[in-house]
Regions:
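Prokaryote-biased recognition of long, low-complexity C-terminal linker/tail segments
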Residues: 6, 168, 172-244
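Intrinsically disordered, low-complexity regulatory segments
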Residues: 1-169, 173-175, 179, 240-257
Length: 259
């Protein structure tokens, strides 16, 4: 049997229909020599600091740089902490059984960096050794799926894509964990979230906000010209340039008027 893993149930359903896996089981479809299962986004994530024995925000613990990153099932937030998402844990068990009982895995997660990471993190977390190939398609038409299945590619072709995604994931963790803890400790109260993407984005929003708040109206001069466009129409033009002083605007105005 071969197992196909898609990134979400809707994609798995379309692929299952094409390969004849019409029998619905818990967490997958089966039939025609295939099992077609699915993730729902990232089922596996990098462990939080407490996974490395680091609890709370303590200055002496910074920077937090794990020698080796640990993978854990996706967590959900509770009132005081985080716990494994029960639905995710259940799906991982199903996928693990299918992967380890198959002769080959066909990776049908999204054709991109994150899609590759979703599968690889899951594959490594399970500790699977079953060989895998890549279904690389960007459309879910019947033709695209069939063509992709006829032209499966070696999984190793996308090793560098995985490494790029892994580097992004780990850098986000390092910036987020260390930045958040450092800023929160420095502030002395509350938790201040820092992120590789979210913090520069917030800075842009804040900068624009203060530009608007501090904006003061200043007079300027601009050229406006009206010309006969024919058939009784008037064509109006405005200069792209604006001047804070009247003199240079007047000089240009006279040049245009005299030309």
């Amino acid at each position: 049997m071969k197992t196909i893993i898609a990134e979400k149930p809707s994609v798995a359903r379309e692929i299952a229909r094409i390969v004849g896996a019409t029998k619905r089981e818990e967490g997958y479809f089966e039939g025609g020599g295939y099992a077609v299962t699915w993730a729902f986004g990232h089922l596996v994530q990098l462990a939080m600091p407490d996974g490395y024995g680091i609890r709370g925000f303590v200055r002496d613990n910074l920077p937090v740089i794990p020698e080796t990153f640990t993978l854990i099932p996706r967590q959900e937030k509770t009132e005081k902490s985080y716990k494994p998402d029960s639905g995710v844990v259940s799906q991982i068990k199903i996928i693990s059984r299918l992967f380890n009982g198959s002769e080959q895995i066909i990776v049908a997660t999204d054709a991109g960096r994150e899609g590759e990471l979703i599968f690889r993190y899951l594959y490594h977390y399970i500790g699977c050794a079953t060989p895998f190939v890549r279904l690389w398609i960007s459309s879910l038409t019947d033709k695209a799926i069939r063509d992709g299945l006829r032209n499966l590619e070696a999984g190793s072709k996308y090793d560098n894509l995985y490494l790029a995604a892994k580097a992004r994931s780990e850098s986000d963790w390092l910036v987020g964990i260390n930045g958040t803890q450092a800023l929160s400790i420095a502030a002395g109260h509350g938790t201040y979230s820092v992120g590789r993407v979210q913090t520069p984005t917030l800075a842009m929003v804040c900068a624009r906000y203060w530009e608007n708040r501090r904006f003061t109206v200043e007079p300027f001069w601009q050229l406006h010209i009206a010309a006969d466009g024919g058939d009784g129409d008037t064509v109006k033009f405005s200069s792209t340039g604006k001047w804070k002083e009247m003199e240079p605007a007047t000089v240009l105005y006279n040049k245009v008027k005299d030309s």
